[in-house]
Amino acid sequence: MSLVSNSIALIERGANEILKFDELERRLRSGRPLRIKAGFDPTSPDLHLGHTVLLNKMRQFQDLGHQVVFLIGDFTGMIGDPTGKNVTRKPLSREDVLANASTYEDQVFKVLDRTLTEVRFNSEWFEKMSAVDMIKLAAQHTVARMLERDDFAKRFASQQPIVIHEFLYPLIQGYDSIALRADVELGGTDQKFNLLMGRALQEHHGQPPQIVLTMPLLEGLDGVAKMSKSLGNYIGIKEPPIDIVTKTMKIGDDLMWRWIELLSFKISAAEAVALREAVAKSELNPREVKLRLAHELVSRFYDNAAAEKAIAGWQAVVTGQGNNNLLPLQKINVPADGVRLVALLTKSGLAPSNSEAMRKLKERAVRVDGIVVDDAHLHFVPGFEGLIQIGKRNFIKVRLVTSSESQEFPESNRIDKS
């Protein structure tokens, strides 16, 4: 295969659609570094694996020698992206946007090569725009064209309000491509309309229209809905290593292959096919593949040592292999006179309610430091430190404290083998 053919094979991996493919091939053959753009509105301070689908593709372009522009939409974030919404999104304040954006650089450079990345803010050009300039921009598209967007069309048909500023969002995102002279813009499949807007506006302004590359939306831990912090089905890239491992081990086998395609750098497309065949023939336990993926993710966001330690901690409890001293110790604040076991099970997040905790105790599914217990009144005082389990699937290593500095253990950190 030629160099260009190899590049295209890497670029195509996991991609949903490339428009126009022949233009991409022609620009790659030119031999010049392309400008690859992807925009992120800072609506939240933390990024999750769903965001890294685009970051990973950007990194692949960097590995091929191209220049990446990581665009922080501090201006567009104050408008609110209407994509996929059946109601108007609440705009963020300037303070919220800047606070969220301040956390992005440290996170994105866990994936991107800093030396081949421009970090830009779209307020650079929009804050210089006059009202006349904005009206001229708005004049470049029709309301009828905007209503071709699926979400706008549905809201219009159901008589849900569409606010005028929402029509401006695709135009403003498209104008970013003019300001940055983008060769390629990346986005989720839900962003296709906005990405094509950039292409149309570039052509209108005499620039070569950008190639549009859409990536699938990553399904979350449930394997159904797209990964979202609001749905709780996400893995944040700043989460502790043990949490990344345990959440990755929870995903279904079918979802595992999807994640490998979109998230893995180390498992090639060809190897993924071979692994899938081995699993189908029962020659390989899918758990081993998930462990490999989990190791890669933790290594990317932390380092190899953190990955080894987290996996050893997970194996110590779930498979009985290794040393459970490697598990992180979670502080749980309790009253000075202590807490009963039922309350501790709910307080730790192992059980959703006292009644469910009682049911598990009656089933003799609860263990403390490996010993089965069924006494709901068993009392624990501050200073207790140990491993509490419900079955083999859910467990937490705790230290009971009364300090005001302690933090209750969040549910997302529970280990669940299911």
Swiss-Prot record:
Alphabetically, the GO molecular function entries are:
ATP binding; RNA binding; tyrosine-tRNA ligase activity
Record EC number: 6.1.1.1
Residues of the signal sequence? Answer: none
The cross-references to InterPro entries, in alphabetical order and at most eight, read:
aa-tRNA-synth_I_CS, aa-tRNA-synth_Ic, Rossmann-like_a/b/a_fold, S4_RNA-bd, S4_RNA-bd_sf, Tyr-tRNA-ligase, Tyr-tRNA-ligase_bac-type, Tyr-tRNA-ligase_bac_2
Where is motif 'KMSKS' region found? Answer: 226-230
GO CC, sorted alphabetically, is:
cytosol
Which GO terms fall under biological process for this protein? tyrosyl-tRNA aminoacylation
Q: Does the UniProt entry include the keyword RNA-binding? A: yes
Q: What keywords is this UniProt entry annotated with?
A: Aminoacyl-tRNA synthetase, ATP-binding, Cytoplasm, Ligase, Nucleotide-binding, Protein biosynthesis, RNA-binding
Which Pfam families does the record match to this protein?
Answer: tRNA-synt_1b
HAMAP family of this UniProt entry?
Answer: Tyr_tRNA_synth_type2
Q: How does it assemble?
A: Homodimer.
Q: Which family does it belong to?
A: Belongs to the class-I aminoacyl-tRNA synthetase family. TyrS type 2 subfamily.
Q: What is this protein called?
A: Tyrosine--tRNA ligase
